């Protein structure tokens, strides 16, 4: 189907404005908002708590329970955006389907894609059972007894995760039967919404894992095409990213296979926008892990490595504009954690951190800090990935959160 950008972009805060509503306004949403505003778009930021990072820069901000379909539909009807862009998982996806059916707004990428990716069950069944993509062995369970049985069939080590969570919350690796009950309880506590259901995954003995940022955007022929960023390598701790770098060195065969997998799953989801496709790589073999239909946390590195960051690419794809995935320099990112449980924290050492060559910081402005909450990121470039990684780690270590 041939698609096109809006014929005319309006002026924010006027009757002719082009309006985008973001559902979820954390640090990734904040960067998307800034990218949209640079294109003259009026942005409405929505989150579950006041003064979220995106709230602080949007034209208007709302605090609602986005898992409440009536509240979400009321807000969409009130604001009448042209585009509704989910940025988190915990959203009433039935309400998004209603928005699409009524023609109230365009849902990015689609209501169906949001529904399928909001929990690990929907996307895993699509990838493995419908598309036939290689994945780790897996089972779903909704009681401790079912989890125990699943681990016996899959074997140890294995990974137990909530069917819906973000940033690694509720995820743990289990190495023997003694850890199963603790992992089950941790998964129930860590889900965005407690469905009482988990996925038990076999452990993939991978060489490394990547995020293949994949953009579905309108090409020169007026058709939606698929565009790839260079692969992003990353390290995780308890399922939460702590470092990322771009490009990740890969064999030609592994890179081609990664893009084949990414194109298949994103085409099946449809719509426009950027997708973060997480993959395990073992030699030339590639295994699908997860996909997010939005900018990916590991993609924060693109703030300095690409001509257009993942956030700018998402903004352009949303609006039907051309995209450019050119890599301009090797780079890396390293997470700055809160370190303390407190509200309204400060940061010491910022000048020292920014004295590291070719380094920038993003402090997200989250109103509440936790010891393991991501409160900022250091992003560095260099002549090669290893230099950039060393610089990013050093810069992040110089920032000290203080209550």
From Swiss-Prot:
> What GO annotations for molecular function exist for this entry?
ATP binding; magnesium ion binding; phosphoribosylglycinamide formyltransferase 2 activity; phosphoribosylglycinamide formyltransferase activity
Residues that coordinate or bind Mg(2+):
278, 290
Q: Name one GO cellular component term.
A: cytosol
List of residues binding ATP: 120, 161, 166-171, 201-204, 209
Q: Which reaction does it catalyse?
A: N(1)-(5-phospho-beta-D-ribosyl)glycinamide + formate + ATP = N(2)-formyl-N(1)-(5-phospho-beta-D-ribosyl)glycinamide + ADP + phosphate + H(+)
Basic and acidic residues: bias regions: 386-397
Question: NCBIfam families in the record, alphabetically?
Answer: PRK09288.1 (NF006766), purT (TIGR01142)
Q: Which family does it belong to?
A: Belongs to the PurK/PurT family.
Against PANTHER family, the record matches this protein to:
FORMATE-DEPENDENT PHOSPHORIBOSYLGLYCINAMIDE FORMYLTRANSFERASE (PTHR43055:SF1)
Put simply, this protein is called Formate-dependent phosphoribosylglycinamide formyltransferase
- Tell me what organism the protein belongs to: Rhodococcus jostii (strain RHA1)
**Gene (name only):** purT
């Amino acid at each position: 189907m041939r698609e096109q950008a809006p014929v005319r972009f309006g002026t924010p805060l006027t009757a002719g404005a082009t309006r985008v509503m973001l559902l979820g306004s954390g640090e990734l949403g904040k960067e998307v908002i800034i990218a949209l505003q640079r294109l003259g778009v009026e942005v409405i930021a929505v989150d579950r708590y006041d003064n979220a990072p995106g709230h602080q820069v949007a034209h208007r901000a709302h605090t609602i329970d986005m898992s409440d379909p009536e509240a979400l539909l009321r807000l969409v009807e009130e604001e009448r955006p042209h585009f509704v862009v989910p940025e988190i998982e915990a959203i009433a996806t039935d309400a998004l389907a209603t928005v699409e059916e009524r023609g109230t707004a365009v849902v990015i990428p689609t209501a169906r894609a949001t529904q399928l990716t909001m929990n690990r069950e929907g996307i895993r069944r699509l990838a493995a059972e419908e598309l036939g993509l290689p994945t780790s062995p897996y089972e779903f369970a909704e009681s401790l007894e079912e989890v125990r049985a699943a681990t016996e069939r899959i074997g140890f080590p294995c990974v137990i995760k909530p069917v819906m969570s973000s940033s690694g919350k509720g995820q743990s690796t289990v190495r023997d039967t003694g850890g199963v009950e603790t992992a089950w309880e941790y998964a129930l506590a860590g889900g965005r919404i407690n469905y009482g259901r988990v996925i038990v995954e076999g452990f993939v003995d991978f060489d490394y894992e990547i995020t293949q940022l994949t953009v579905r955007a309108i090409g020169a022929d007026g058709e939606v095409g698929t565009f790839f960023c260079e692969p992003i390598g990353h390290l995780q701790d308890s399922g939460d990213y702590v470092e990322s770098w771009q490009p990740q060195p890969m064999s030609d065969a592994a890179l081609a296979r990664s893009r084949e997998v990414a194109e298949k799953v994103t085409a099946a989801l449809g719509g426009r926008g950027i997708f973060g496709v997480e993959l395990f790589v073992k030699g030339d073999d590639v295994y699908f892990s997860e996909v997010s239909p939005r900018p990916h946390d590991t993609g924060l590195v693109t703030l300095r490595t690409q001509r257009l960051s993942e956030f700018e690419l998402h903004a352009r794809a949303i609006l039907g504009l051309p995209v450019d995935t050119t890599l301009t320099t090797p780079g890396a990112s390293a997470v700055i954690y809160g370190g303390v449980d407190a509200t309204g924290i400060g940061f010491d050492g910022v000048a020292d951190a920014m004295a590291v060559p070719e380094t920038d910081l993003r402090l997200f402005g989250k109103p509440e800090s936790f010891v393991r909450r991501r409160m900022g990121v250091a992003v560095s470039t260099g002549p090669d990935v290893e230099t950039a990684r060393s610089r990013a780690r050093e810069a992040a270590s110089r920032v000290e959160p203080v209550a």
